[in-house]
Amino acid sequence: MPKVGMREIRRAQLIDATLRSIDEAGLPGTTLASVAQRANISTGIVSHYFGDKDGLLEATMRHVLRDLWSATTRRRTAARKDPRSRLRAIVAANFDDTQIAAPVMKTWLAFWSQSMHDPMLKRLQHVNTRRLHSNLCAEFAKALPRAKAREAASGLAALIDGLWLRGALAGGPIDTRAALKLAHDYIDLLLASD
């Protein structure tokens, strides 16, 4: 009989091993066997929990997305209630330590690439995109007319993605201070234009 709570412990262990495998070998080099090796368990156990490599990547991305959503909620809750502060909190969540660690950044890049070919991953990406846009739009709408708020949300979402992507591809740690400053300046510009 399995130990109580072991399933979640084992899944977390395997997701961590998947992140490390993608970091070290890329998505093509990540297999059920490479994940099992990093987790010091049998390939059969990985298969038991996730089925196949696609199931493993989906579970890993769900974990990364939960971390992003948790960071967003935590930072928005802690921010002052004005739109500028809450927008800055949303931006900061996208550059949270849970999102800029090398294994996570490489997993995001692999996920984006795979989401163009896998319907489930595409759906996850679509949900993430809509959630970011909705959160940004809700805050901009407190200070801007609805149409302008939607446009501002699209622009800021593109800036967040672009800053994050450039940072991820730079080959070293993301300069979060510089990225946040650019995003904050953009927010200030948009809110001042009204």
From Swiss-Prot:
Q: Which SUPFAM superfamilies match?
A: Homeodomain-like, Tetracyclin repressor-like, C-terminal domain
Q: Which intervals hold domain HTH tetR-type?
A: 8-68
Extract the DNA-binding region annotation as residue ranges: 31-50
What Pfam families does its record include? TetR_C_6, TetR_N
Molecular-function GO term, any one = transcription cis-regulatory region binding
Does the record bear DNA-binding in its keywords?
A: yes
Described purpose of this protein according to its UniProt entry: Repressor involved in the biosynthesis of the osmoprotectant glycine betaine. It represses transcription of the choline transporter BetT and the genes of BetAB involved in the synthesis of glycine betaine.
Instruction: Cite the PANTHER family for this sequence.
Output: HTH-TYPE TRANSCRIPTIONAL REGULATOR BETI, HTH-TYPE TRANSCRIPTIONAL REGULATOR RUTR
Q: What is this protein called?
A: HTH-type transcriptional regulator BetI
